[in-house]
Structures are given as C-alpha cells and as structure tokens.
A protein has these predicted regions:
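C-terminal or late-domain output modules
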Residues: 1-6, 13-70, 167-229
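Generic alpha-helix signal with a bias toward terminal, lower-confidence helices
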Residues: 11, 38, 42, 69-74, ...
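Alpha-helical linker/edge segments of TPR/alpha-solenoid repeat scaffolds
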Residues: 66-77, 83
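Exposed beta-sheet edge and beta->alpha loop/turn motif
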Residues: 80-229
C-alpha cells in the first residue's frame, strides 16, 4: 500500500489542469495587490477594494483554443491613412481660414451674442465655417477610432510577447495570430465588506503566436477578461 500511495499522489497532481497554477498565482497576487506581478499576467484588473478577492476556486471546464489572425499591419496602415487625411484637411481648412480671417473673426464674435444679426456676407462665411468645423471634428474622430483600433489589437499581443531577454515588440513587424481559451471556475468570492459567497467565473486567457521580424515568437498567456465578478 505504501508503494502505491506516491503514484496515486502523482496521478492526482498531474490531473490538475495546467491553468490551475497560473490562476492560483494571479488570484494570490490580486489579494496582495502585487501590481508588478499582475501587470505581467493580466490586461484587466481585479481590485480587492471594488470587486473583492477570489479565496478559492475549482476549474470546471476549459474551452478548446480559438485562433484569430492578427492583422496589425492593415490597422497601422488605416491609422496612417486617417492621419494623412486629417493633415490634408487641416491644410485646406487653414487656407480657407487665412483667406477669410477678418470675416471669420467677426462671425465668431457675433456668435456669442444671441441677438446679433449677421450680414449676408457674414452668413455665407458662417455657413462655410460651420461646415469646416463640423468636418474637422469628423476627421478627428476618424483618427481617434483608427488609433483605438491599433491600441486594442496591439495591447494584448504586446503584453503577451514582452518578455525578459526578448527584443521589443514592433507591431509593424509582427505576423501571426491570437490564441484564446475560456476557463470556467467555481469560485469563493470575498466581497469588499468581508462576506463570502460562491460565484461562477469565466476567465479568458490569451497569447500571441507568430513571427516578429522573421523570428518565431510564442507569447506567454495573459488574462484579457474576467466575467462573473
């Protein structure tokens, strides 16, 4: 019997999902508010002061890995085009402004007075200037949206691939995909008031896989979503 026991213990240890150790370390760091460790493991926060802490958990299921191509180059190109379009528009707007500056200044001043009456010439310039200002906001929003798309796409990939001793992440030189899986947990959550209750959590783990500057790279797993807490 004594010879069988170590084998049984080994089998039990081996039956633990590989995600168990990773999540145990993450929840421990969250309880301790170890921000350095958390930053290396997760792109989302789990603040004990707001969401509580995971005191214990059991993994009930892990979904198959899902692979999504990560086309950063097209996103970077879209951002470049948006910035170029905004720059060209700003140039044309400045040309109009310089050509009509005295009247524009009059219009801007009169806009502050609700009782002011514009001359026909001022009304023409005001209509044109309103359109320039409206279009300017449209171009600004387009650049912001393009930039946000780049940040949203590169953030998890950069976090996954940024490792000691490895070259820095260059989104323009990366070709590959994001690999993700959902880990479902039965957890015991202690809320900020100190009360403990069961909860079902779904933790999404993601990593980047591909080539960076022609060199094969495989990123570490990071947490990109925690649902249920």
């Amino acid at each position: 019997m004594t010879a069988v026991l170590p084998l049984a213990l080994t089998a039990a240890a081996c039956s633990r999902p590989p995600e168990q150790q990773f999540l145990t370390q993450f929840f421990r760091a969250a309880r301790a508010r170890d921000n350095t460790t958390l930053a290396m493991m997760s792109a989302v926060s789990l603040d004990p002061r707001e969401q509580g802490t995971v005191e214990d958990f059991t993994i009930t299921s892990v979904t198959p890995e899902n692979r999504t191509p990560l086309d950063l180059k097209s996103l970077l190109e879209a951002e470049r085009q948006a910035r170029d379009a905004e720059s060209e528009f700003a140039k044309r707007k400045m040309e109009y402004q310089n050509a009509n500056l005295p009247v524009i200044e009059q219009v801007v001043k009169l806009e502050r007075d609700p009782k002011a009456r514009l001359t026909p010439a001022q009304q023409v310039v005001k209509a044109a200037w309103d359109k320039w200002r409206e279009d300017s906001a449209t171009y600004t929003r387009a650049v912001s949206a393009a930039r946000a798309a780049v940040v949203d796409a590169t953030g998890p990939a950069e976090a996954s691939l940024t490792q000691p001793g490895q070259p820095p992440f260059d989104p323009s030189a990366f070709t590959g995909e994001m690999v993700s899986k959902d880990v479902v947990l039965d957890a015991e959550i202690r809320n900020p008031q100190g009360q403990t209750a069961p909860a079902t959590l779904t933790v999404t783990m993601t990593r980047a896989v591909g080539t960076l500057g022609g060199e094969a790279r495989e990123g570490r797993w990071i947490i990109t979503r925690i649902a249920g807490v």
